[in-house]
Amino acid sequence: MKSLLSILMTTVVLSPIAVAQGPGHSPARDLETTDMGAQQLNTIGVSVDRDLQFTDERGYPFTLQQLFPGKQPVVLMLGYYSCPAMCGQVLEAAFYALGRTDLQPGTDYRILRVSIDPNETPEIAANRKAAFLVKLLKTNGEDSWRVLVGDAENTSALAEQVGFQYYWSEATKQFAHPPSLIFLTPEGKVSRVIVNSYFEPDDVRLALVEASQGTLGDFWDKVKLNCLTFDPRTNSYSLAVMTLMRIG
């Protein structure tokens, strides 16, 4: 049993979690939006409303019933397409991490980007998708990820369900909101939330494996999830010492 403990310790300690730093990495985080993001950590297990109505980038009606229940986990990103500040940096960091998970959008997971600005149009969403997102991540088919707009009622309802707090600042003429990735199970339940302006590829991979409920991941992913716990203070998976001691 001691040898098993040694193997697990070696595997976890040598894991590249919290080592690779992608674009947009910055230790300094906005305190206000970080505090806003803390609310998201209380929504684990909450189901999103499948009847919420949006419009996709092609101008077609879209409800969350078109995603849930499904066969793959979903990465939900809330923000807005015309954001002049943080959103672009966060998206770049997210796609950098997703692109290094060895998991494929469309095949292994799906991506959902929803605007919190009720004034944004499908045309804005389509232009943003074409100009920015496609350059950052290869996708397997048009439906592997969707970009949506919606009215204030539906977007605010979705945001509230996943604990995503935001407000319009008259001072800056921008929406203030936390930078985050929200991982949903194939049934549409919040499985994990990472609140940060950068994302480690191994953390993102483990969050996807965790959200998949057993359909994704290899043996070592499962070992890591048994030996690591998600630490909301660091927004990262870290060594669960008590678990290892029990194994030993």
Regions inferred by a protein language model and the residue ranges of each:
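N-terminal targeting signals for export/organelle localization
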Residues: 2-55
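Structural microenvironment flanking redox-active thiols in thiol-disulfide oxidoreductases
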Residues: 91-155
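Extracytoplasmic/lumenal ectodomains and periplasmic regions of secretory and membrane proteins
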Residues: 168-225
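Extracytoplasmic
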Residues: 47-49, 69-73, 106-111, 142, ...
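Short, acidic, Ser/Thr-enriched surface-loop or helix-capping motifs
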Residues: 56-57, 184-185, 231-232
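Juxtamembrane/start-of-transmembrane alpha-helix segments at the extracytoplasmic/lumenal side
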Residues: 231-248
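Short active-site neighborhood of thiol/selenol oxidoreductases, capturing the structured segment around
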Residues: 64-94, 111-112
